[in-house]
Amino acid sequence: MAKSKGARIIITLECTECRTNSDKRSAGVSRYTSTKNRRNTTNRLELKKFCTHCNKHTVHKEIK
């Protein structure tokens, strides 16, 4: 029998300031990968992480 898909999924977090800010340290968009339990956290995650392109801590939002 095949196993059912688990509750944990891999998500991608993207910096919100890299998309809008033109005067940053280097070109590109900062992205992190993480896991979340889709049964406990149904809405999209927002975490403060360090952005290497902006060179500061910024809000990273979950993207599809």
From Swiss-Prot:
InterPro entries: Ribosomal_bL33, Ribosomal_bL33_CS, Ribosomal_bL33_sf, Ribosomal_zn-bd
GO molecular-function terms, A-Z: structural constituent of ribosome
Position of the signal peptide: none
Cellular component, GO, one term: ribosome
Biological process terms in GO annotation: translation
Keyword set includes Ribonucleoprotein: yes
UniProt cross-references to SUPFAM superfamilies, sorted A to Z: Zn-binding ribosomal proteins (SSF57829)
Keywords in alphabetical order: Ribonucleoprotein, Ribosomal protein
Pfam families: Ribosomal_L33
Origin superkingdom: Bacteria
HAMAP family: Ribosomal_bL33
Similarity-based family: Belongs to the bacterial ribosomal protein bL33 family.
Protein name per UniProt: Large ribosomal subunit protein bL33
Lineage, top ranks: Bacteria, Bacillati, Cyanobacteriota, Cyanophyceae, Nostocales
